[in-house]
Amino acid sequence: MKQPCVYIVASRSRGTLYTGVTANLPRRAFEHREGLVNGFSKKYGCKVLVWYELHESMIEAITREKQIKAYSRAKKIALFAKTNPSWKDLSTDLYSVRKVRRYRTASA
């Protein structure tokens, strides 16, 4: 899944939030989960992918990231409150889709 996107990772349910941007969400989610990203997210243990939004270009994604970073905590939570109310780790879904795509490609 190489596509520009904005994402939010959390330290735990109702915990600290970090907003970021990447062109490779599965890789970046893995890096956060394993503590490979130095800085704020590592310091506060932000490892759970709770929200993401895909974009057509990196410029568009960076613009949106800046917009979201300026949001209050409540407004950030409102982005995913209806679609992910339990703050489930969405990265597991990314890896499942990736494995299915690999399998289909290999067997085709």
PLM features: what roles do these ranges have?
Residues 1-38, 42-48, 52-54, 59-66, ...:
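GIY-YIG nuclease catalytic motif and its immediate N-terminal context
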Residues 43, 66-79:
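Short arginine-rich
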